[in-house]
Amino acid sequence: MIMSKDIATTPELSEPDKYFVEQRDLLLQEITSTLDSILNNLNGLNISLENSIAVGKEFESVSELWKVFYDGLANGAAPGVAAANPSSQDLPTEPVAAHQNAAAGNSDAPAPSQ
């Protein structure tokens, strides 16, 4: 708290001057308390921002994993997945309908070649 000279001990000040000094001291006290409040609120904001940044950093690895997954889908396959998928050479060349008709017992359908 900033205080000027004690008004009661200074007899040379006139009444308007005393009033001015009192009002100035009140304003300085109000400004000081407001600045303290602003500083405390800024510290709270800083802590909140640091916490949100920390949470964001915790999700970086998850974000990177999803990025690799998405890039793999965009490129057709993720690295190392192409070997696990059957190629078109491994697929049977007969139509699927022929197998379904034979299983249903339709005699009109050609028998599957083996």
Swiss-Prot record:
Belongs to the DASH complex DAD1 family. Residues 80-114 are annotated as: Disordered. It comes from Eremothecium gossypii (strain ATCC 10895 / CBS 109.51 / FGSC 9923 / NRRL Y-1056) (Yeast). This is DASH complex subunit DAD1. It is found in: Nucleus; Cytoplasm, Cytoskeleton, Spindle; Chromosome, Centromere, Kinetochore. It holds the Pfam family DASH_Dad1. One of its GO terms (cellular component) is cytoplasm. InterPro entries: DASH_Dad1. Component of the DASH complex that connects microtubules with kinetochores and couples microtubule depolymerisation to chromosome movement; it is involved in retrieving kinetochores to the spindle poles before their re-orientation on the spindle in early mitosis and allows microtubule depolymerization to pull chromosomes apart and resist detachment during anaphase. Keywords: Cell cycle, Cell division, Centromere, Chromosome, Chromosome partition, Cytoplasm, Cytoskeleton, Kinetochore, Microtubule, Mitosis, Nucleus. One of its GO terms (biological process) is attachment of spindle microtubules to kinetochore. Component of the DASH complex consisting of ASK1, DAD1, DAD2, DAD3, DAD4, DAM1, DUO1, HSK3, SPC19 and SPC34, with a stoichiometry of one copy of each subunit per complex. Multiple DASH complexes oligomerize to form a ring that encircles spindle microtubules and organizes the rod-like NDC80 complexes of the outer kinetochore. DASH complex oligomerization strengthens microtubule attachments. On cytoplasmic microtubules, DASH complexes appear to form patches instead of rings. One of its GO terms (molecular function) is microtubule plus-end binding. Disulfide bonds: none annotated.
